[in-house]
């Protein structure tokens, strides 16, 4: 699978030292747009930036710049996707808009985000007929369990680690209910 990442999920998984889950599950590519790296993470994730940059340099995360999109002859498509998604999802969270737009443009088919507000991209992508499947960090952990990569105990332990490191106050039971 291929995935485009939103800002918060990057921060949550890196703070818990569980970023490797992304590379294991999305073995065909993990992608971020340059603005998520240069603006969003610079402002909200300075504590994990060195690790993210290391993974970009190691080729674990593919960073898409405007120039790279132009070289692939898809920059105008990306711009159109950004414009449409800003209207659909409110320009308040550009990280989400960029992550969705990148997924649409390059055919990533998976969006990993932790923004599950009503009317937001996660809920809309689940309810409407889109080619992109949204996942939260909890969804990724549950998928990893269902694929037999880890057992239930490890899944719960990892959920609690991310939940506590990022002070999310999420309930694992409610995340399982949403997943089902």
In which residue ranges do the predicted regions lie?
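Short acidic/polar active-site loop segments enriched in Thr and Asp
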Residues: 109
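Active-site-proximal, substrate-binding regions of enzyme catalytic domains
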Residues: 1-106, 118-180
